[in-house]
Swiss-Prot record:
Function description: Involved in the regulation of root gravitropism. Functions redundantly with LAZY3 and LAZY4 in the control of root gravitropism. Functions redundantly with LAZY1, LAZY3 and LAZY4 to control plant architecture by coupling gravity sensing to the formation of auxin gradients. Involved redundantly with LAZY1 and LAZY4 in the regulation of both shoot and root gravitropism. Mediates gravity signaling in statocytes downstream of amyloplast displacement, leading to the generation of asymmetric auxin distribution in gravity-responding organs.
Superkingdom to which the source organism belongs: Eukaryota
BP-aspect Gene Ontology terms: gravitropism; positive gravitropism; regulation of growth
Keyword entries, A-Z: Growth regulation
Reported consequences of knocking out the gene: No visible phenotype under normal growth conditions. Roots of plants lacking LAZY2, LAZY3 and LAZY4 exhibit a negative gravitropic response, and grow upward in the opposite direrction of root gravitropism.
Comp. bias (Basic and acidic residues): 59-74
DNA damage listed as a keyword: no
Native species: Arabidopsis thaliana (Mouse-ear cress)
UniProt key word Acetylation: no
Family, as annotated: Belongs to the LAZY family.
UniProt motif (IGT motif) ranges: 42-48
PANTHER family in UniProt: OS03G0406300 PROTEIN (PTHR34045), PROTEIN LAZY 2 (PTHR34045:SF21)
Name listed for the protein in its UniProt record: Protein LAZY 2
Amino acid sequence: MKFFGWMQNKLNGDHNRTSTSSASSHHVKQEPREEFSDWPHALLAIGTFGTTSNSVSENESKNVHEEIEAEKKCTAQSEQEEEPSSSVNLEDFTPEEVGKLQKELMKLLSRTKKRKSDVNRELMKNLPLDRFLNCPSSLEVDRRISNALSAVVDSSEENKEEDMERTINVILGRCKEISIESKNNKKKRDISKNSVSYLFKKIFVCADGISTAPSPSLRDTLQESRMEKLLKMMLHKKINAQASSKPTSLTTKRYLQDKKQLSLKSEEEETSERRSSSDGYKWVKTDSDFIVLEI
């Protein structure tokens, strides 16, 4: 707010100076007219009066010069007095206040631009009134029309150019994205086609066909066949040995069991024989009281 007050004081001081200087000069110029207005024109035509009028005019011109110099001195003194006060006021501001003042000035400038645009619109609206009221000044009306139209056309052209640039940039970016996507899709398709064609070649190509792998030599085939035969023989032997080992174990078990049973039977028979031999001849009593020798 201090800054705005200082600006207003400066502006008001300049206007007052200009008005006072103009008023003083106008007043000085009007004084001789008022003095000579009462005198008759015949007296001025005489030579004696003409000489006196010249001397009076010279004195008045000197007085005017003196007054102008005095006013210049006064203005210089007032400017010298205002300059330190303005510097003091500027020193009192902080950087935050300066930033706020800059923002306010930007707002004022934007408002002035808006006002100018509003004025141009009003001029465009009030064109028939201007033509009607200022009929002799048709050239000025035409100039105003041309200026307003040029301003409007320039602003519209600038906006159109900006819009066109934006749309062009958007279109170019989209085209780049589409081209990149199409390239990636083509690469994927080529890879899939190559893989499928390679598989078909592998499946359907004959031994003497266009196969990329080299054909095996006779030595390799012979060596492979010999090794395969040996491996097969080894496997067969192992399998037969395992199969034969299983029934032998069973037969041995059965044989041993049979041996045990036979041994048990033989032992039982021997024991029975021994018992019979140990008993010898026995007397057996019967109901008929006959003695029978049982062997």
